Amino acid sequence: MLTFSFLTLFPELLAPFASEALVGKARARGLLDVQLVNMRDFAENKHLKVDDTPYGGGAGMVIRVDVVERALASLPPADEVILLTPAGERFTQQMAEELSRTTHLAFLCGRYEGFDARVERLATRELSLGDFVMMGGEAAAACVLEAVARLVPGVLGDEDSHRADSFSSGLLDYPEYTRPAEWRGEGVPEVLKGGNHAAVARWRREQALARTLARRPDLLPSAGLTPQDSAYLLTLGVTPEQLAAWGAPPPPLPKRRRGAKPNPN
């Protein structure tokens, strides 16, 4: 069972993520567990103060490293101690899949001016959601919880669900539709209503390729493109030179008509 431990000054911010929706159901079924650790419980003063003024001066308060160390020591050893910080490496779907195969993840959620720099020695990994700054690490940690927990076997009702998600195939996800069949003049693509599973699969793959090309072309070099993908991308205006730069295979050769003789030229 995978356990998520969150070291925070505001456990009430994370409580809904731990008790509601699929994560809450997974906890009830014993598929995973979530522990909320209030770092104030490890302060050694009557006011439960966990921070102090920064050396060298400056605005704000800094969370003490000794408090964090005591809070971590109260937990069983973690496979990863993750510090949420704008300076960390960008969190990806690949990382989520890697983390889902562990048994215990501990998250350090900062506040105010952040942690004493020596907290980095307690972390095994530093993660960031992007190039922006939030008021604390709890929201970022909740995002990682959602991304990782859904990959734990049994958490999703349909085990194939996450395999078709954006990034799982290396591409953005294809568009999905449901009833009504028409809304404000926009209908559902006919191919999705025809019952031809091969045609639906081909349409979805092409839509994922088109979306990725338009919105995140940087993903294409690592998307595991096939010769058929290359052929479709050429119809979207991609050049053979671009395909070669991405490391994509060449499109399949046109099939020769049965009985046709090779052109001697």
From Swiss-Prot:
GO terms for biological process: tRNA N1-guanine methylation. Signal peptide: none annotated. The keyword tRNA-binding does not apply. It is found in: Cytoplasm. Its main location: cytoplasm. Residues 243-265 are annotated as: Disordered. One of its GO terms (cellular component) is cytosol. One of its GO terms (molecular function) is tRNA (guanine(37)-N1)-methyltransferase activity. It is an enzyme of class 2 (transferase). InterPro entries: Alpha/beta_knot_MTases, tRNA_m1G_MeTrfase_C_sf, tRNA_m1G_MeTrfase_TrmD, tRNA_m1G_MTases_N, tRNA_MeTrfase_TRMD/TRM10. S-adenosyl-L-methionine binds at G110, L129, G130, D131, F132, V133, M134. It catalyses: guanosine(37) in tRNA + S-adenosyl-L-methionine = N(1)-methylguanosine(37) in tRNA + S-adenosyl-L-homocysteine + H(+). Disulfide bonds: none annotated. Its EC number is 2.1.1.228. Residues 254-265 have a biased composition (Basic residues). Keywords: Cytoplasm, Methyltransferase, S-adenosyl-L-methionine, Transferase, tRNA processing. Specifically methylates guanosine-37 in various tRNAs. Belongs to the RNA methyltransferase TrmD family. This is tRNA (guanine-N(1)-)-methyltransferase. It comes from Deinococcus geothermalis (strain DSM 11300 / CIP 105573 / AG-3a). The lineage of its organism: Bacteria, Thermotogati, Deinococcota, Deinococci, Deinococcales.
